[in-house]
Amino acid sequence: SQVGMVLNLDKCIGCHTCSVTCKEGMEYAWFNNVESKLCEHCLNPACVATCPSGAIYKREEDGIVLIDQDKLCISGCPYKCIFCYPRIESGQPTVCSETCVGRYLGVLLYDADRIEEAASTEHETDLLYERQLDVFLDPNDPKVIEQAIKQGIPQNVIDAAQRSPVYKLALPLHPEYRAADAGELGSNGILPDVESLRMLSAGDTGPVIRSQTVEGVTDTRALEEVGLTEAQAQEMYRYLAIANYEDRFVVPSSHRIDAINITEVR
């Protein structure tokens, strides 16, 4: 299982609250410029593999990537965060998420055996989008639940994955979570412009094409093109516009005592 975060950049107003709370809450280095990005806590982090001293490691129970302060390793990313793991362990969201209106936290179940296959695609655009989705598992699938229990994943983590806003909305990719620059409209007047979404799928525009009309009449043509139902679109609206606290943050308390010490495995 992996704890994941989603940022809705449409709601970012540059208020600096995320950086201020990180500075005050973690007493950690911070930067003057608003940077709505953070350590990705990757499923297969390259920094862990390249650190010569083995000081960087990925936690087994929640997938958070940390640096062992008793060892020496220069982080390749100046924005390295610890994902507020003491708060995550107690079932609380990160401080930046709790003070930001556009952040969502939740649990994802994934198949670690598929990571190498997804990363080994010969060409960047060859099913990159589909391969990424194949890594993540449906938490409502009985077979997935059965296998997760066999792997020692606690029931409360499985329950959290089933209610996870990250699984429901972030995957597959939606333009509402775009990482492209805002402030410009394409020639067709659609925001975001399809051309701006190419970065989400290595240049392949097919998977990220979306359209929306607001005319007081339900137009399902765009939904049919992307394989969404009207109910799913309504659910997206609920999460993106009027979500409650418990909808945005679904973080199970940690079972760290049951987790394998991944530093020993490494």
UniProtKB/Swiss-Prot annotation:
**Coiled coil start-end:** none
Q: What InterPro entries does this protein's entry cite?
A: 4Fe4S_Fe-S-bd
Q: How is its activity regulated?
A: Inhibited by micromolar concentrations of azide.
> A GO molecular function for this record?
metal ion binding
Tell me the lineage of the source organism: Bacteria, Pseudomonadati, Pseudomonadota, Alphaproteobacteria, Hyphomicrobiales
The function of this protein is: The nitrate reductase enzyme complex allows Bradyrhizobium sp. USDA 3045 to use nitrate as an electron acceptor during anaerobic growth. The beta chain is an electron transfer unit containing four cysteine clusters involved in the formation of iron-sulfur centers. Electrons are transferred from the gamma chain to the molybdenum cofactor of the alpha subunit.
| Gene Ontology biological process | anaerobic respiration; nitrate assimilation
Main location, first listed in the record = membrane
Where is the signal peptide, in residue numbers?
none
Enumerate the residues binding [3Fe-4S] cluster.
51, 73
Which branch of life, at top level?
Answer: Bacteria
UniProt cofactor(s): [4Fe-4S] cluster; [3Fe-4S] cluster
Q: How does it associate, per the subunit comment?
A: Heterotrimer composed of an alpha, a beta and a gamma chain. Alpha and beta are catalytic chains; gamma chains are involved in binding the enzyme complex to the cytoplasmic membrane.
Q: Cite the binding residues for [4Fe-4S] cluster 1.
A: 12, 15, 18, 100
Give the protein name, as stated in the record: Respiratory nitrate reductase beta chain
Q: Which PROSITE patterns match?
A: 4FE4S_FER_2
GO (cellular component) term, any one: plasma membrane
User: Per the UniProt entry, what species is this protein from, by scientific name?
Assistant: Bradyrhizobium sp
Instruction: Name the catalysed reactions.
Output: nitrate + a quinol = a quinone + nitrite + H2O
Q: Which SUPFAM superfamilies match?
A: 4Fe-4S ferredoxins (SSF54862)
- Induction pattern: Induced by anaerobiosis, there is no significant expression in an aerobic environment. Expression is further induced in the presence of nitrate or nitrite.
State where [4Fe-4S] cluster 3 binds. Answer: 39, 42, 47, 77
